[in-house]
């Protein structure tokens, strides 16, 4: 996952998830933000990742598995409007939390 970063926006009723590619020290967006459970963010990310040239199938599986774990964690902790960011970081070291609202 060192080549990819998952970004989340932690909201009270939704979680927004996007994937960026890390090239050197710069991040480049690979996907839009998709909202769970407002829409099926996992499926939308899968479709968008499927369309990415040069993305290996094993990397896609790792990314989507990580997204699944993040969604599960959000569902278990969504009552917490502001998550404990250090706890989030310990569960998901490659995660970038874009904000909490």
UniProtKB/Swiss-Prot annotation:
<dbReference type="GO" id="GO:1990904">
    <property type="term" value="C:ribonucleoprotein complex"/>
</dbReference>
<protein>
    <recommendedName>
        <fullName>Small ribosomal subunit protein cS23</fullName>
    </recommendedName>
</protein>
<dbReference type="GO" id="GO:0005840">
    <property type="term" value="C:ribosome"/>
</dbReference>
<dbReference type="GO" id="GO:0006412">
    <property type="term" value="P:translation"/>
</dbReference>
<dbReference type="InterPro" id="IPR038447">
    <property type="entry name" value="PSRP-3/Ycf65_sf"/>
</dbReference>
<comment type="function">
    <text>Probably a ribosomal protein or a ribosome-associated protein.</text>
</comment>
<keyword id="KW-0934">Plastid</keyword>
<keyword id="KW-0687">Ribonucleoprotein</keyword>
<dbReference type="InterPro" id="IPR006924">
    <property type="entry name" value="Ribosomal_PSRP3/Ycf65"/>
</dbReference>
<keyword id="KW-0689">Ribosomal protein</keyword>
<dbReference type="GO" id="GO:0003735">
    <property type="term" value="F:structural constituent of ribosome"/>
</dbReference>
<dbReference type="Pfam" id="PF04839">
    <property type="entry name" value="PSRP-3_Ycf65"/>
</dbReference>
<dbReference type="GO" id="GO:0009507">
    <property type="term" value="C:chloroplast"/>
</dbReference>
<comment type="subunit">
    <text>Part of the 30S ribosomal subunit.</text>
</comment>
<comment type="similarity">
    <text>Belongs to the chloroplast-specific ribosomal protein cS23 family.</text>
</comment>
<keyword id="KW-0150">Chloroplast</keyword>
